[in-house]
Amino acid sequence: MESCMESKKQGQISIIMPVYNGVSWIGECIESILQQTDTNWELLVLDDHSTDGTTELVLKLAEEDSRIFPILRQRNGVSAARNEGLEKAQGEFVMFVDADDKLDPQMLSVLRAMLGQTESDLAVCDYYRWNGKPDGIYNRSEGLLKTD
């Protein structure tokens, strides 16, 4: 019998992105994933029956890059979408993003390097929050997990 790890794509990162009516920002999010220096990933976009053009945009982007997999679903909410993404993910590692996130181009490379240095089952990273003002105010997250 094949083990779960043998059926997964060794080293690949599955990025799971639930979305509902995110056409205003999902393009920037996907573009930030496409710009990653680490290219061993798949993107599962779980569209919760969007009505604003999100579906069409994701389908177009999937035609342009074979690593993008649109999953069109009935509207069941973000938690159900994430769970479905976990079921369909083919990568050895899983990462969750929201449609309004933007990743630094080195994000996956740094994540992979850190996972390679440890035997960790979970990685948490800092993030910056932009409040939408033209001058861009960012707040760094700190102290989410304690190691002692």
Language-model region placement:
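Nucleotide-sugar donor-binding/catalytic module of glycosyltransferases
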Residues: 2-148
